[in-house]
UniProtKB/Swiss-Prot annotation:
Start and end residues of each stretch annotated as Disordered: 61-84
Activity response to pH changes: Optimum pH is 8-9.
Annotated organism of origin: Arabidopsis thaliana (Mouse-ear cress)
Name of this protein: S-sulfo-L-cysteine synthase (O-acetyl-L-serine-dependent), chloroplastic
Modified residues (N6-(pyridoxal phosphate)lysine): 140
Biological classification of the source: Eukaryota, Viridiplantae, Streptophyta, Embryophyta, Tracheophyta
GO BP field: cysteine biosynthetic process from serine; photosynthesis; photosynthetic acclimation; regulation of hydrogen peroxide metabolic process; regulation of superoxide metabolic process
Amino acid sequence: MAFASPSLRLLPQSPLGRITSKLHRFSTAKLSLFSFHHDSSSSLAVRTPVSSFVVGAISGKSSTGTKSKSKTKRKPPPPPPVTTVAEEQHIAESETVNIAEDVTQLIGSTPMVYLNRVTDGCLADIAAKLESMEPCRSVKDRIGLSMINEAENSGAITPRKTVLVEPTTGNTGLGIAFVAAAKGYKLIVTMPASINIERRMLLRALGAEIVLTNPEKGLKGAVDKAKEIVLKTKNAYMFQQFDNTANTKIHFETTGPEIWEDTMGNVDIFVAGIGTGGTVTGTGGFLKMMNKDIKVVGVEPSERSVISGDNPGYLPGILDVKLLDEVFKVSNGEAIEMARRLALEEGLLVGISSGAAAVAAVSLAKRAENAGKLITVLFPSHGERYITTALFSSINREVQEMRY
């Protein structure tokens, strides 16, 4: 499987390709509106608008203001140049509008950027994959679309008929919610009552119905409640993201290839949060398929790990633990501190999970054995989703106390 290098990604259908093509045609057309005459007082050719000659011919004056001595009729303009079929096709493609059919077509192809100021002491380069720039600001936008499309293609769900039900801690629910809104589905999400208020507000803004569950039961409590709702609701359907292979598939088909292409295959280490297991398994699986020597590193919170530690969380069925070369445990405090630094020093407003992934990436980049390597780290969500959390608690107090 081969992918074009970044330098070859400019296509006629791309916005920049269309602009470049149109500018070229505009420049060519504009040049035809000018004629050139020689100024005896200068060695330069003076560009004079053709319109001036036309006015001169009508008024009997030339563009220099003198009487026109010629009474002969002007020769008709030459016929336009003959274009080949290929040229006409290129022009037609270049004039295609760059407008998505709906918001789902904006998902994916997120940019990558080097980290520069939080990398003191690093021996390897670190490039971040900004999933925070998805249309609904999270890597979960990809699986929201993937799971809905897979279910539609199998005939399991139908817009304006099926009621979608899904347990979530916020980001996956939002990824499903905005796609459901665009396609015409009703959505019910179950979530622990401990989830921050802005995620609830965003879900409601997108039309989702929210059912809160006992926070002490964690995500498992939300899963159990979702199953209960499905049994009681007509035409209800539950995606079961933790066991849904569409979760992994979309990252194998899109996220992995995007990283491979943007790095021109030079990635050495891939770092991502474990979460549902879909991102790290799908993306890591593709990268290892392309180069078996690429290391895949999973990141999990030390307070509630799913693989290691004394407080195991909910182990996703789609997580391929054997794919992981290493697992990093990062504390909530470390993740918050790094997320704040990313905003202040890199201009990247990202969430707590992104901070955790960055902590792991920086630690790896300081190892002697990784000197000169390229580490790619996935930032899964935007910082605006964490305004009322501990990430911005001090700023929240500061702005609340502001007076005019």
